[in-house]
A protein has these predicted regions:
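Non-catalytic structural scaffold of enzyme domains
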Residues: 1-172
């Protein structure tokens, strides 16, 4: 966005959002977004999967339709990218419990013919990443627990549905 000022807000007081109930995440995220819109921002970008899942419909209704402020989130772009690259239509999602329970990714992929989503909540990944534990036996044990069922189900494309995952676990692959 050349020529635009970018304001980054990270809710460090309440992060990580992943372990929080989805209704609490919705309240927290909408409160921050209300302040931003009231201050005159031209666009909202929600870079957290859990926050995106929690506020997706409310944010579009409240800000895009209600006030003309576009809302960009991470769920639909990730779902579209996964649908484009899958070879067998079996897409896996690893995410926080709130993101999985919200069905936001399932809803985003619902209209894509021939695609099946298999979702797994990975709560320990966020906690480990927050503690700086990104390699070692704890991570590998959790990775096997979370990823092996997806591999066994024939998943060929994996959505990393939490921003902690691609930053903290760059070396992980589906187990063979």
């Amino acid at each position: 966005l050349p020529g635009e000022q970018v304001l980054y807000i990270g809710d460090t007081e309440h992060s990580p959002y992943g372990p929080r109930p989805i209704d609490e995440v919705r309240e927290l995220a909408l409160a921050v977004m209300d302040e931003l819109v009231d201050s005159g921002v031209k666009m909202l970008v929600i870079a957290c999967n859990t926050a995106s899942a929690a506020v997706l419909h409310d944010a579009r209704r409240r800000y895009t339709l209600g006030k003309g402020v576009p809302v960009v989130e991470v769920i639909h772009p990730a779902a579209r990218a996964a649908a484009r690259v899958t070879r067998n239509g079996r897409i896996g999602l690893i995410a926080t419990q709130g993101t999985v329970d919200s069905r936001a990714y399932a809803d985003a992929l619902e209209a894509v013919p021939g695609v099946e989503l298999l979702s797994t909540a990975c709560p320990d990944f966020v906690e480990l990443a927050e503690r700086g534990v990104t390699t070692g036996p704890q991570v590998m044990s959790r990775a096997e627990e979370y990823l092996l069922p997806l591999r066994e189900a024939g998943v060929d494309t994996l959505i990393l549905g939490c921003t902690h995952y691609p930053v903290s676990y760059t070396h992980l692959t589906l187990p063979t």
